[in-house]
Regions:
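Short secondary-structure boundary/capping segments
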Residues: 1, 43-44, 68-70, 108-109
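N-terminal beta-strand motif that seeds the catalytic metal site of vicinal oxygen chelate
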Residues: 1-18, 26, 76-78, 133-135
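Residues that flank catalytic or metal-binding motifs in active/ligand-binding sites
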Residues: 5, 40, 48-50, 74-76, ...
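Core segments of cupin and vicinal oxygen chelate
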Residues: 11-60
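Vicinal oxygen chelate
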Residues: 13-18, 73-126
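Conserved catalytic-core motifs of GNAT/GCN5-like acyltransferases
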Residues: 29-36, 103-108, 131-135
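A short, acidic/glycine-rich surface segment
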Residues: 39, 60-66, 102-103, 109-112
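Short glycine-/small-residue motifs
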Residues: 51, 126-129
Length: 135
């Protein structure tokens, strides 16, 4: 037995609706998971088997909350793989009103060398979109 991969991670935000709209404009699917006996969970779906759960900063005050002991806004830094080209990444960001912070620049990601563009989401989390070279 071994760890297989990442199922999900959490970002902590000020305004759930605003954050979900931001990621929707970037082409990600938004879903609300209905959990019996617990509040619904907003999620940002990534492909078939990964997601980002979205927690509001005040959720630790809710009964039954299970999450970070000291959640913080803007504390996330993550990389998402883009299936298109770097110019397409730049066009998507421009069309979405997002200003790149760094890039395009060469980086080493999980599968090796890639080209990345970095930007901030509405809560100041650092988001990296990376493009691997064609084989």
């Amino acid at each position: 037995m071994a760890i297989k991969g990442i199922d999900h991670w959490v970002i902590v935000v000020r305004d759930v609706a605003h954050t979900l709209e931001f990621y929707r404009r970037l082409g990600l699917a938004i879903a609300w998971e209905h959990r019996p006996g617990r509040p619904d969970m907003p999620t940002i779906r990534i492909g078939d088997g990964q997601k980002i759960n979205v927690h509001a900063i005040d959720w630790p005050d809710r009964p039954g909350y299970l999450g970070a002991r000291r959640p913080s806004i803007g504390g996330a830094d993550f990389c998402l793989e883009w299936t298109g080209t770097v110019p397409e990444v730049l066009h998507l960001l421009e069309r979405s009103g997002v200003t790149p912070e760094v890039g395009p620049s060469t980086r080493t990601c999980a599968r090796g060398p890639s080209t990345s563009v970095y930007f901030r989401d509405p809560d100041d989390n650092l988001v990296e979109l990376t493009v691997y070279p064609e084989p």
